[in-house]
Amino acid sequence: MVGRTLTALPALLCALTAAATPTARLAKRDPVPSFVLQNAPVSHLWSQEQWWPADVAEHLTHMVPEADFSAVAQGVTLETVGGLGSDVFLTSKDDVTKQPAWVTSAVGTPDASAKSAAPATIVLVEKDGGILDAFFFYFYSFDHGGKVLDIEFGDHVGDWEHSMVRFVNGAPTTLYLSAHSGGSAYTFDVTEKTNGRPTTYIAGGTHANYATPGQHCHDLPLNLLCDQTDAGPLWDPTLNFRGFWFDSATSTFSVAGGADVGGQEEPAEGASWLNFAGAWGDEQYKILEHGQYCIDIPDVVDECKFVSGPTGPIAKNLGRTAVCQKEDSCTIETSL
């Protein structure tokens, strides 16, 4: 188990007590352990991707918090979003069908060194039995859901996906990859490696995570809906990230430090933003709004062009016992 620093001067404790609000926001623990960074996944984005990794802080500058389609505040930042209710949808100020620059986030395209200008989010959770789950969260400002019979469905503003490496006594044992409403899990040793680190593939538009490149069909019969992956730009989340610890017993986050832009901005931002249990994008549009339509074909599709934005890391079962987010159906694959 990762050690904790428990000693503190009485005077410092008094000072922190007197400043309760900033104390909670700036609570800190140990930095992200080196064994986590050394075994963190690296990911290939699709070579034809159009909606690249985004910085959550930048995303919020284009949002207005709404509940029941009415604004509850004029704006929102990482420092304030954690205080919003679970009924809140962070709603875009712009018409996203016009694909403004913040939606496509081309600035987040990884460079030749595999660094993205958009910080990833790493969340560490200690558990019984020497277990440490390291979650690597990837954020995008837009999800392009795909096409069924050449009709677009499932687009939404905001997109959270994640991978998770489970460590036991500091050794990596398993890898979980989120994809749409589910995901897949593998023993760590069978995963493809790049310089000893697991290599994953992120689908174009939907940003679902897979262990192998190629086509991955899902959700609908007759292979009507498929994700595409290949060895496009490589993304190393450890080069730019915000790091945190999560205590599942108290449901509290604390700052662990980070790297590059994420590490520089994190001290002022704190950890409270991770408490936001609302949606990181627009509520599902009404029919005809922004070209919205819905189609119900029995046994084929019951979906709308635009759906509501997703919840964030706090809703991803961080305290899970099994490796998978959905614990009642978790198979750990021993081959690719």
Which role fits each region the language model picked out?
Residues M1-R25:
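Fungal secretory targeting signals
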Residues T21-D159, T174-L336:
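A domain-level signal for the mature, folded cores of soluble proteins
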Residues R166-G170:
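Short beta-strand micro-motifs enriched in acidic
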